[in-house]
Regions:
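Non-catalytic nucleic-acid substrate-recognition regions in nucleic-acid-modifying enzymes
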Residues: 1-187
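Class I S-adenosyl-L-methionine-dependent methyltransferase catalytic core
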Residues: 1-24, 29-44, 139-140, 159-172, ...
C-alpha cells in the first residue's frame, strides 16, 4: 500500500488529487486530510513517482490497533515496544523501499556488520559536525555505498490524547527497530525515515520514499511568494486543459504556474506576464532552465489592461496578490476589479475557464459583483499556502457579451 501526501492541500481541493491518482494508476483511493491511500502493484510504482500533484510518497508498512491506557505513560510506551517487537513486520515494505530508492547498501546487516559500522560512526559524526552543507532531510539513498549499513530515524506524529509525547514514542519505537534490524541511528543524514502515525488507538508505520518533497522542482530563482509546483499543477488540472488551448498566467511572479503548465500540458500554449521587471527576469531565467523547449512565452504587462484580443483566451490560471506577504488589501480592492473586468474581455465566452488563487476573499467577492454576469463560480476550494488559509475559485465565462 502506498500513501501519497500533500500537506498543502485539504478539503475539496483533494478531489483533484484523487482524480489524478485514478487517472494515473486506475485504482480506487481512500482519503483523509492531507493524505490519500491506495494499493498499487509493483509494475505501477513508476507511475506513482511520476504524479505531479503530490508532495511526498510513503510505503505503508503496517497498520495495527492498540489499546492504550491513556493515563499510565510507562504502560502505554511498553505497549508500543511490544507491538513493534512482535507485530511490526517491515520486510516487504523494506524490500520495496530498497528497490524504489535504489539504495545499494545493507538493509539487513548482521550484528557484526552493525558493530563494525558503529566503530566508524564516531568519525562520521565528527565530519558531520564540521560540515556546513548537511541536508535537513537526510540524504539520497541512491548515493550510498554498497557496504553502507542503513542509517535511519523515526519520526512520530500523533492525533488524539495520549499519556506520552511524540518524541518519547519515537525514541521507544526507534530503539526497538534498532534492536530488531541493527541499523545506525542518524537524525540528520539518514537514508530512511520511518514515520509512525499514532492516531488515537491505531499506529500506522510508513517508510518515506521521497527524500525531499516533490514540490521542490522547476524553480531556481525564487521570489518572495513563489508557489509550490504541486499546487501549480493542481490549479492547472482544475481548469481541464485541452490540446491547443491558450492558457495565460497574468501574474506569473517567478513563473511557477506557466513552467508546470508547459511541462505537464505540452500540447497547450502558455502565455505569462507580470508588471514587475524583477519578476519577469526571474521568470525568464526559470523558464530557460526548466522548460526551454516548451510552448511558454513571457512578456511584461499590466493586468489593468492586458494586450490581448477580445475573446482570445481559453484558460486563465493565476496566483493573485494575497494582501499579506505581497501587495496590500487596500490595493487589491481596486486591482481585483480591474483584473476581473479584463479577464471578462479576453476570455472566450461560454467555454472560457478561470482558476484563481487568493487569500483576500472579500476583495474577490467585491470584484465578482463588479464583473456582473460575466462569470459564474462553479467551485470554491480550500488550500493552505504557507500557513495561510487561501481559496481557489473556479469560474466559467458566461455567454454575456463584454461591453
Amino acid at each position: 500500500m502506498d500513501n501519497a501526501e500533500n500537506s498543502s492541500l485539504y478539503g475539496l481541493f483533494q478531489e483533484s488529487l484523487t482524480d489524478d491518482n485514478l487517472f494515473m494508476i486506475g485504482t480506487s483511493v481512500d482519503t483523509e486530510r492531507g493524505n490519500i491511500y491506495f494499493n498499487v502493484p509493483w509494475d505501477q510504482l513508476v507511475k506513482v513517482q511520476e504524479m505531479r500533484s503530490i508532495d511526498n510518497i510513503f510505503i505503508v508498512g503496517s497498520i495495527l490497533k492498540l489499546m492504550f491506557d491513556g493515563i499510565n505513560k510507562e504502560a502505554d510506551l511498553k505497549l508500543c515496544t511490544n507491538v513493534v517487537h512482535n507485530n511490526v513486520k517491515l520486510e516487504k515494505a523494506l524490500n520495496a523501499w530498497k528497490s524504489i530508492t535504489q539504495f545499494p547498501g545493507k538493509v539487513y546487516p548482521t550484528i557484526n556488520e552493525y558493530e563494525e559500522a558503529l566503530k566508524h560512526d564516531k568519525i562520521f559524526d565528527n565530519l558531520k559536525a564540521t560540515s556546513s552543507k548537511i541536508r535537513k532531510r537526510g540524504q539520497n539513498p541512491a548515493d550510498a555505498e554498497i557496504n553502507d549499513v542503513l542509517r535511519y530515524r523515526v519520526t512520530c506524529e500523533r492525533i488524539g490524547t495520549h499519556s506520552f509525547e511524540s518524541p518519547e514514542a519515537a525514541r521507544i519505537i526507534g530503539g526497538e527497530l534498532q534492536d530488531k534490524y541493527h541499523w545506525l541511528v542518524d537524525l540528520s543524514t539518514y537514508h530512511l525515515e520511518i514515520i509512525c502515525k499514532i492516531i488515537k488507538n491505531e499506529i500506522v508505520t510508513q517508510l518515506r520514499i521521497t527524500h525531499e518533497s516533490k514540490h521542490h522542482r522547476n524553480i531556481m530563482h525564487f521570489g518572495p511568494t513563489t508557489l509550490r509546483a504541486t499546487i501549480c499543477y493542481n490549479l492547472l488540472r482544475l481548469a481541464h486543459p485541452n490540446p491547443g488551448d491558450i492558457i495565460i498566467d497574468p501574474m506569473c511572479g517567478s513563473g511557477s504556474i506557466p513552467i508546470e503548465g508547459g511541462l505537464a500540458y505540452e500540447n497547450s500554449y502558455m502565455l505569462c506576464g507580470d508588471n514587475h521587471t524583477k519578476a519577469v527576469l526571474r521568470s525568464k531565467s526559470n523558464i530557460n532552465i526548466s522548460c526551454p523547449k516548451s510552448k511558454v512565452d513571457l512578456t511584461q504587462w499590466s493586468v489593468s489592461y492586458l494586450p490581448l484580443l477580445n475573446s482570445s483566451i481559453d484558460i486563465v490560471v493565476t496566483d493573485m496578490p494575497f494582501g499579506k506577504r505581497s501587495g496590500k488589501i487596500s490595493d487589491n480592492r481596486v486591482l481585483y476589479k480591474e483584473f476581473l473586468l479584463q479577464l471578462g474581455r479576453v476570455v472566450k465566452p461560454i467555454t472560457g475557464r478561470l482558476v484563481l488563487l487568493t487569500y483576500d476573499r472579500r476583495s474577490f467577492h467585491l470584484a465578482l459583483q463588479r464583473a456582473g454576469n460575466l462569470f459564474r463560480v462553479t467551485k470554491m476550494l480550500g488550500v493552505n499556502v504557507g500557513g495561510l488559509h487561501a481559496a481557489v475559485y473556479v469560474l466559467k465565462r458566461t455567454k454575456i457579451e463584454y461591453k
